[in-house]
C-alpha cells in the first residue's frame, strides 16, 4: 500500500517508498490472457511495453472477465507515462499525478522497478463549505436546506451521507451551470434513509430495489418551496458481467462508489454531516479536471463497460465546455471496435437520444457523436458523412422555425430522421431494429416517400394552398419532416405553411349547418366540410355567409348530377 506521506508533512518520502506494485516487461503482441499469466507469475501490478507505456493488471483482469482475453494487452495501455527516479521526492510524484497521470513509473539503476498508482496516493480533503454557504436563490436555498437536513439526519442515525456527481461538478464549475436534481449517497441503507427523508419532506418515494436506490419527488421545504427530484442510493460497487449490460451491485464504501463512476468530474463527493460539512472526497482528481475543463475516463474500458457514457460525454462537452483528453479518445476507439453490445437494449439507446433532445443545443451534441463515429453502436456499417452533418444543421433550423411559429414537433423523431435519412436502406433498417423501433414507425422513417413528396412540392411552380394541403395532409409526420429535410426552398416553405396554418384550417360551418342545407347524414357531410375548408384555404370564402353560398352552389351541382336526392 502507498505510504500516507501527507499525514507526516515533516517527512519527504521518496518515490521508492511510495511504490505500490511491481512491473514486468512484456512483448507488445501478447494477448490480454497471455499478459495476465506473465503478470501473475511475476506478481506484478503493471505490464510494460516501453519505458513510458504500461497497463494495469486490474484493467486486464476486467477485460478477461468479459471474455476479451483475445485483445492485445497494449489496447489497454497508458502511453507517455511519467518516469521518475526512485530517489525522487513525494512532492515530485504528487505533482505528476496531480497533472493527470493515472500512474507514475519508478526507475532505479537504469531499470524500471515499480509504479505508483494515482488512486493509491492519499490527497488532502479541501472544504467546499464556503461555496455551499454562498448558494443563493430559491432553488439553491432549497437545495442547501435539504443538504443540511440530510447531513444532520444521517449523523443522528450514525450514517455518513454525501452529495455526489453532477451537483459537486457544477458547484465547482459555478452556480450558473446548476442542474435541478440532487444525488445523495448513504454509507448504509439508502432506501431506508430515503423513506425517512420522504417522511420529513412529505414527498413520494419510488424505490428501485435491485439497485438499492430510490427517488424522492414532490418534497417541500418547511416554507413550501419544492425540492425537485432527489435521488438516494446506498454506496455501492458495480460488476458488469458483459460490456453494455446493466451492472450487478454490492454494498461498498464511498471511495469504492466513486471508483465505479464514468468520468473523474463525476467521481467526487461532498460530506454533509455537520462534523464534516463541505469536505470534498476526490480520489480521482476530478477537481483538477473541472478546473482544466478536462473530460477523463477512470479506466480504459470505461466506455465499453457502459457505452451510453459516450452519449453522456457528448452532452457534457456541448453543455459544459469540457474537452475530452487522449485517454477518452483511446477508450472511445476501443469501445466502438468491440462490437454491437447485445446486452444493451435498444430502449436504452433511444433513451439517450431523448435525453440529448432535452439539452440546450441537442444538435451540437448529435454532431459531436457523428464526428466521433458513435452511431456505429447502432450498426457497424453506419457512416458519418458531411451530408449527415448537413441534415443535422437543417434539423436545427427546422426546430428553431417551429419554436418561433408555435408548431410542436417530436424532437426524438426528427433526430432519428436526420441521423438515418442518408444511410443505405439496409443500414437504416438494421439501426431501427437495433433501437427496437417497430412497424409502423419503422416504415414511416423510410426516406423514399419523403423524397417523393419533396420532389412534388419543389417541382410545381404554382400550387393553390388547398393543393399543397392535399399533397401534405395524408402524409405521416415523419415523411413530412423528411421532405422538409431533403427538399429545396420551395418545398420547405410549403411544408412550413402547412404545419403552421394549413394543417389546422377548419370551415366556420359545422356538420349541422351542412345537413340543414339539405345534405343527408353520412359521408357527404364530411365531403362538404372538406370542400368548404379548401375554399377557405384558397381565400375564396371568408365569412359564414360566404360558406352558405358556396355550400348551396355545391349541393345544387350534386343534385344536377344525381348524386344528391
Language model: regions and residue ranges:
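Catalytic cores of the polymerase beta-like nucleotidyltransferase superfamily
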Residues: 1-45, 58-565
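Acidic Ca2+-chelating loop motifs
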Residues: 53-55
Amino acid at each position: 500500500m502507498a505510504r500516507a506521506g501527507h499525514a507526516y508533512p515533516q517527512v519527504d518520502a521518496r518515490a521508492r517508498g511510495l511504490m505500490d506494485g511491481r512491473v514486468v516487461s512484456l512483448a507488445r503482441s501478447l494477448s490480454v490472457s497471455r499478459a495476465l499469466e506473465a503478470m501473475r507469475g511475476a506478481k506484478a501490478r503493471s505490464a510494460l511495453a516501453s519505458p513510458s507505456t504500461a497497463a494495469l493488471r486490474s484493467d486486464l483482469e476486467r477485460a478477461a472477465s468479459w471474455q476479451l482475453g483475445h485483445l492485445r494487452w497494449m489496447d489497454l495501455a497508458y502511453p507517455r507515462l511519467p518516469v521518475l527516479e526512485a530517489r525522487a521526492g513525494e512532492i515530485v510524484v504528487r505533482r505528476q499525478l496531480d497533472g493527470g497521470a493515472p500512474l507514475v513509473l519508478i526507475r532505479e539503476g537504469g531499470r524500471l522497478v515499480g509504479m505508483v498508482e494515482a488512486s493509491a496516493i492519499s490527497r488532502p480533503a479541501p472544504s467546499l463549505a464556503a461555496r455551499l454557504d454562498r448558494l443563493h436563490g430559491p432553488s439553491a436555498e432549497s437545495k442547501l436546506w435539504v443538504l443540511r437536513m440530510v447531513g444532520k439526519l444521517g449523523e443522528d442515525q450514525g450514517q455518513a451521507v454525501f452529495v455526489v456527481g453532477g451537483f459537486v461538478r457544477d458547484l465547482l464549475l459555478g452556480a450558473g451551470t446548476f442542474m435541478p436534481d440532487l444525488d445523495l449517497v448513504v454509507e448504509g441503507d439508502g432506501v431506508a434513509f430515503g423513506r425517512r427523508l420522504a417522511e420529513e419532506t412529505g414527498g413520494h418515494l419510488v424505490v428501485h430495489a435491485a439497485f438499492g436506490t430510490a427517488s424522492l419527488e414532490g418534497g417541500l421545504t418547511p416554507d413550501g418551496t419544492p425540492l425537485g427530484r432527489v435521488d438516494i442510493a446506498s454506496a455501492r460497487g458495480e460488476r458488469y458481467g458483459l460490456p453494455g449490460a446493466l451492472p450487478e451491485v454490492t454494498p461498498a464504501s464511498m471511495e469504492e462508489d466513486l471508483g465505479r463512476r464514468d468520468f473523474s468530474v463525476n467521481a467526487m463527493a461532498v460530506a454533509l454531516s455537520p462534523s464534516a460539512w463541505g469536505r470534498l472526497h476526490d480520489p480521482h482528481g476530478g477537481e483538477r479536471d473541472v478546473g482544466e475543463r478536462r473530460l477523463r475516463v477512470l479506466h480504459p474500458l470505461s466506455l465499453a463497460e457502459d457505452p451510453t457514457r459516450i452519449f453522456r460525454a457528448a452532452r457534457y462537452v456541448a453543455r459544459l465546455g469540457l474537452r475530452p483528453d487522449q485517454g477518452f479518445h483511446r477508450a472511445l476507439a476501443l469501445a466502438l471496435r468491440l462490437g454491437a453490445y447485445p446486452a444493451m437494449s435498444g430502449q436504452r439507446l433511444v433513451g439517450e437520444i431523448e435525453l440529448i433532445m432535452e439539452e440546450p443545443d441537442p444538435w451540437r451534441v448529435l454532431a459531436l457523436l457523428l464526428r466521433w463515429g458513435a452511431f456505429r453502436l447502432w450498426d457497424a456499417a453506419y457512416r458519418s458523412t458531411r451530408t449527415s452533418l448537413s441534415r443535422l444543421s437543417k434539423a436545427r433550423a427546422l426546430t428553431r422555425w417551429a419554436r418561433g411559429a408555435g408548431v410542436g414537433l417530436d424532437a426524438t423523431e426528427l433526430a432519428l430522421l436526420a441521423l438515418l435519412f442518408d444511410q443505405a436502406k439496409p443500414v437504416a433498417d438494421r439501426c431501427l431494429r437495433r433501437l427496437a423501433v417497430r412497424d409502423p414507425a419503422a416504415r414511416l422513417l423510410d426516406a423514399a416517400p419523403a423524397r417523393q413528396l419533396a420532389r412534388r412540392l419543389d417541382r410545381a411552380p404554382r400550387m393553390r394552398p388547398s393543393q399543397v394541403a392535399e399533397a401534405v395532409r395524408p402524409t405521416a409526420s415523419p415523411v413530412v419532416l423528411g421532405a422538409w429535410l431533403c427538399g429545396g426552398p420551395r418545398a420547405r416553405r410549403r411544408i412550413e405553411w402547412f404545419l403552421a396554418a394549413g394543417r389546422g384550417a377548419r370551415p366556420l360551418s359545422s356538420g349541422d349547418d351542412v345537413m340543414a342545407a339539405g345534405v343527408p347524414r353520412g359521408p357527404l357531410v364530411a365531403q362538404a366540410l372538406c370542400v368548404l375548408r379548401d375554399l377557405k384555404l384558397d381565400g375564396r370564402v371568408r365569412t359564414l355567409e360566404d360558406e352558405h353560398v358556396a355550400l348551396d352552389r355545391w349541393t345544387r351541382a350534386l343534385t344536377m348530377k344525381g348524386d344528391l336526392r
